[in-house]
């Protein structure tokens, strides 16, 4: 019995070392949109992320103040809390929604099934589209397609709502991302975004230990840059397409428990080891340092979880919106 325990401990330590080596030697640095697509294709195809995180590849909402909650349930709760915060719950059935960075469609299906919305989900990953389509019953009014959030294929003023969860860190051009999100909204339409952000380094520059931590958080999951909450709100306002003010809030405390819960899933669900084998175990352990760094960064104030809400102004988009040129002719004229 003792020998078996020692063998199991040695095997776990060996796989942990291998996972750490892979983490250090083979980061997933952002190179282009293709590198993001390839990363999500790989994560989708091996099934490990879906097994542990469910249909929602985003953090959970644990309440205010946060309380203990089932990890998968917290993700469902996040969607409903975001609907309420964005003031979408009273919109009529048939409201058209664009889910930007839809993953494998978890949020899209809730929005369609439980709120009666007509949802289009887009992702840069072909394999995520395939899996989202497999998971979506025919009676659920949600469809999915490959698209680029920096150059959306939809005409101006196409949707009543644009919704996005944790897609922004993958965008190298935050100003263009902001413009595209608002461009495809109808006048009076609502934009609701949830994202990982960093502290506004214009106010408090990153210190000597924060810079390497931030570099690891960017390089391990194909992130070119994190915006600050203040900075992305300014990018949205600078498009000239927002009616009134951009509303923001900070959900760091509400989402913080999700990082350690992500690791805990591997402990409380050991059947994953049987299902995915030694290779799956090594892949899972490879992600643990990033989860721990994320918990450290969000807990210490280096990173923040930002929420954004904006209403689309009744103006036309021009090619020079980013430079401040707006056609004030009403869209419907």
Label every model-predicted segment.
Residues 2-50:
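N-terminal auxiliary segments of SAM/dcSAM-dependent transferases
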Residues 72-93:
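Conserved alpha-helix/loop element of class I SAM-dependent methyltransferases that forms part
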Residues 98, 104-151:
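Class I SAM-dependent methyltransferase SAM/SAH-binding core
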Residues 150-162:
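A short acidic, Gly/Pro-enriched loop at the edge of an enzyme's catalytic core
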Residues 161-173:
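A short SAM/SAH-binding and catalytic strip from SAM-dependent methyltransferases
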Residues 175-190:
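A short glycine-rich, Lys/Arg-flanked "PGG" loop and its adjoining helix->strand segment in the class I
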Residues 193-195:
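Acidic carboxylate diad motif detector
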Residues 205-207, 212-302:
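Substrate-binding/catalytic lobe of Class I Rossmann-like enzymes that use SAM or dcSAM, i.e.
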